C-alpha cells in the first residue's frame, strides 16, 4: 500500500507540474489564456484522469482527457496523454497528430519532443525525425540523447560528413575520449580520408 501511495503521489505531482507548466506556457499566448476557473476545472479533470489511469480504468480516463481538451484545446499535457492511448490502440495517425500538437504548443518540454522523435523513427519518417532532433539538440543543449539519435540515423544513411559533424558536437560537450576518437577514425576510413583518420589516433 505504501508503494502504491508513493506511486500515486509521484504521478500526481508530475501531473500538477505539467498543468502548471501548461498554464505558464499559455500565459505567453493571450488568445488561448484560461480564466482561473477554467484552469481549476482543467487541473481537476486532468488529475482525475491520472487517478483513473492508475486504477486501470482506461476508458473513463480517456473520456476525461478528451473533456480536458474541451476546456483547453491546446493543453499539451492532455494531448500527450491522449497520444499514449491512441498509440496503445494502434491508432498511429491520431497519436502522431496529438503528439505533434503537444510539441507545437509546448516546445520547451523535452519529453514531449523526445516522444515525438521516437515515434517518427518508429514510423520510419526519418526526415521529420532528423528535423526535430536537430532542433532539440539546439533547444536542449544539456541533453545528449538527440545527438546520439542523430548519430544513429546518419550512420544508417551513410551520411558520413554529418556523422563526423555530430561526433564533433558530442566531443564539444563531453570532451575528447578514446571512444569518440576511434569512432571518428572508423568513419574517416569509410570516407577514404586517411589523413584525418590517422590524425584522430595520433
Residue ranges of predicted features:
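Register position in tetratricopeptide repeats
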Residues: 54-55, 88-89, 122-123, 156-157, ...
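N-terminal leader/linker segments that initiate helical-solenoid repeat arrays
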Residues: 16-81, 88-93, 97-100, 104, ...
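Conserved structural position within tetratricopeptide repeats
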Residues: 67-70, 100-104, 134-138, 168-172, ...
Amino acid at each position: 500500500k505504501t508503494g502504491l501511495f508513493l506511486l500515486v503521489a509521484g504521478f500526481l505531482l508530475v501531473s500538477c507540474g505539467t498543468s502548471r507548466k501548461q498554464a505558464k506556457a499559455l500565459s505567453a499566448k493571450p488568445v488561448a489564456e484560461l480564466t482561473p476557473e477554467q484552469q481549476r476545472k482543467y487541473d481537476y479533470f486532468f488529475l482525475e484522469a491520472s487517478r483513473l489511469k492508475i486504477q486501470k480504468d482506461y476508458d473513463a480516463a480517456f473520456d476525461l482527457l478528451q473533456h480536458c481538451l474541451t476546456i483547453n484545446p491546446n493543453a499539451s499535457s492532455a494531448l500527450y496523454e491522449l497520444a499514449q492511448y491512441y498509440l496503445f490502440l494502434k491508432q498511429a495517425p491520431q497519436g502522431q497528430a496529438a503528439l505533434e500538437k503537444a510539441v507545437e504548443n509546448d516546445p520547451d518540454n523535452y519529453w514531449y519532443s523526445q516522444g515525438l522523435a521516437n515515434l517518427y523513427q518508429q514510423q520510419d519518417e526519418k526526415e521529420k525525425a532528423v528535423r526535430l532532433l536537430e532542433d532539440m539538440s539546439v533547444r536542449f543543449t544539456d541533453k545528449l540523447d538527440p545527438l546520439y539519435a542523430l548519430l544513429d540515423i546518419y550512420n544508417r544513411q551513410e551520411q558520413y560528413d554529418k556523422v563526423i559533424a555530430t561526433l564533433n558536437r558530442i566531443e564539444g560537450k563531453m570532451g575528447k575520449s578514446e571512444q569518440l576518437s576511434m569512432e571518428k577514425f572508423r568513419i574517416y576510413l569509410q570516407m577514404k580520408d586517411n589523413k584525418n583518420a590517422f590524425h584522430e589516433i595520433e
